[in-house]
Amino acid sequence: FLETISRRGAYLALLQQYPPALHKLADVIGSSSWAADYLTRHPILLDELLDVRLFDPTPDWQTFRSELRLRLAQHVDDTEREMDLLRETHHAQVFRLLAQDIAGLHTVEHLADRLSELADIMLQTTLDLCWQKLKHRHPHPERPPRFAVIGYGKLGGKELGFASDLDLVYLHDDPEPDVGELYARLG
């Protein structure tokens, strides 16, 4: 981990300038190899150590969703930036939940609920975003899609862990002929 952040002077300066962030970092990377690997893959998350919401154990999911949609709306013509923003937002929230877990703020069940809620929000937001880009191909673009994303496995059981993948099935029930390919692209 230190090798990764030592390549960027800004990260070292941040840790030097904010000793409490360095202590939080030591707690996180000292607690599990998964946490250290996660930060190694996403060193930008060091900024989260300065966020006052880091240890807020009950995310306000409505505000989270609204803020994410507002930030996405600023990049409506830049799909790459939208995808980056979705990833960055997800990584930051996972890191917050990880820090809270390490601090003992969640039971296993409560943490699984929070991770599952996060996955639900990210899936719905992504689906909405993709539909906005594809709906012009539908015979009735003003109608909502007749499309469902079904989570099974750990997501379906609301038992997600930090390293869980998402097992998904996509279903559509649209009476319009020739929309199967559109829904396949949406999935």
Each language-model region and where it sits:
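Non-catalytic regulatory/linker segments of enzymes
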Residues: 1-187
